[in-house]
Amino acid sequence: MNKNTWVIGFTLFAMFFGAGNLIFPPNLGLDSGQFFWPAILAFVLTGIGLPLLGVIVGALDKEGYIGALNKISPKFSILFLIIIYLTIGPLFAIPRTASTSFEMTITPIIHSNSSIALFIFTIIYFIVVLYICLNPSKLIDRIGSLLTPLLLITILAMIIKGYLDFSGNSAGKGNEALYHSNFSSFAEGFTQGYLTMDAIAAIAFSMIVVNAVKLTGITKTNQIFKQTLTAGLIAAVALIFIYISLGYIGNHMPVSDMTLDQLKSKDRNIGTYLLTTMASTGFGSFGKYLLGIIVALACLTTACGLIVAVSEYFHRIVPKVSYKAFVLVFILMSFIIANQGLNAVISMSIPVLSIVYPVAITVVLLILIAKFIPTKRISQQIPVIIVFILSIFSVISKLGWLKINFIESLPLRAYSLEWFPVAIIATILGYLVGIFVKQDPIKYQQE
């Protein structure tokens, strides 16, 4: 394993590790109580396992997900990827990184959510993002060699001090309504990891990783796949360590029922409260600055990864517009949304993500299956169409626009996984139909 692979792996870790990835584990640790281990292991399985799978599957075809999705349908490939890139990019995730950075770095210092302060902060924030993203070939070096080490050092400092401060406490009782047995805790952790929706970002980041591997001089598809897998495993190990560590500390932090009730009444995020408490207990008044640095670095690396991924994709489908022009357009969009109407955008984006996410996971699994089992195009199209339609009706029913009893009665509906057994049945149906349809088996392009 060479230095380049390590740098790519750490870059991938930094791009995945956004502010939300800091907040989820300690919150899960607190809620899981005596059933911490089944909950956190299940969280790791879906919260890290699915994104890792998403990254490495993108390396099966020399054209990445563009080539793999074209095997299902070229029109579907373009539409699906445009929706994914815009939703996790300038219309949702990138503006959120800026606003989250402001709320956790500047707001605690000025004790105000000043719109002027937010405006100034986001100008500086996106200038830095612009500088890093204008040359995508240097993204890996700038993030993997500089920003990631800073991020890891600051996180490790907080984890070590947090462990020393709180590990001596016994685990709290947790949320016994959700975590009352090994099975229920595993199921809840599985669902929470799934709901991070990082698997969608994996489709975007896969292109960056594959391109970075190619820049090292590797051209054969099987070697690209191996290097992508290795880089993905490096990122996964780092994420696993941090998730379990933060979750364990959260599991041993003493938080009274009164405090929890007060936080809920003020609509404050409990995970943010736990992180703030961890930092202030360990480092006093400096703790809020340390946490601010961690959040800013985590958000910045994620924003850079998303800007590069989105811009490269749109430049690829509209080559007449330069990559740098797309970078400027998407940064400007993100800047405007970060300062105006972010809550409205989030409320609109979540239903879209809830529709796209099951389709994305289904697509990843179908591509993986087709690598090892001869698969016809119709055999992939049928489950994708069925899962897509089901996801639309699931969101409609969940939003209360129309109560659909069939959807509500599906297995795993309580865990937002009702699409999964349907996807399995649809995949079997697709393969049965494929037996009677004259099509050549799908072959992913090799060098």
Swiss-Prot record:
Membrane topology classification: Multi-pass membrane protein
InterPro entries: Brnchd-chn_aa_trnsp_Livcs
Organism field: Staphylococcus aureus (strain NCTC 8325 / PS 47)
Subcellular location: Cell membrane
Membrane spanning stretches: 6-26, 40-60, 74-94, 114-134, 143-163, 193-213, 229-249, 290-310, 326-346, 350-370, 382-402, 417-437
Main localization category: membrane
Keyword Transmembrane among record annotations: yes
Similarity-based family: Belongs to the branched chain amino acid transporter family.
Additional note from the record: In Caenorhabditis elegans-killing model mutant strain is attenuated in virulence.
Cited NCBIfam families: livcs
Keywords: Amino-acid transport, Cell membrane, Membrane, Transmembrane, Transmembrane helix, Transport
Role, per record: Component of the transport system for branched-chain amino acids (leucine, isoleucine and valine), which is coupled to a proton motive force (Potential). Contributes to NaCl tolerance.
Signal peptide: none
Top-level taxon of origin: Bacteria
SS bond list: none
Protein name per the record: Putative branched-chain amino acid carrier protein SAOUHSC_01411
A single GO cellular-component term on record: plasma membrane
Pfam family, one: Branch_AA_trans
Gene Ontology molecular-function annotations: L-isoleucine transmembrane transporter activity; L-leucine transmembrane transporter activity; L-valine transmembrane transporter activity
Any Gene Ontology biological process: valine transport
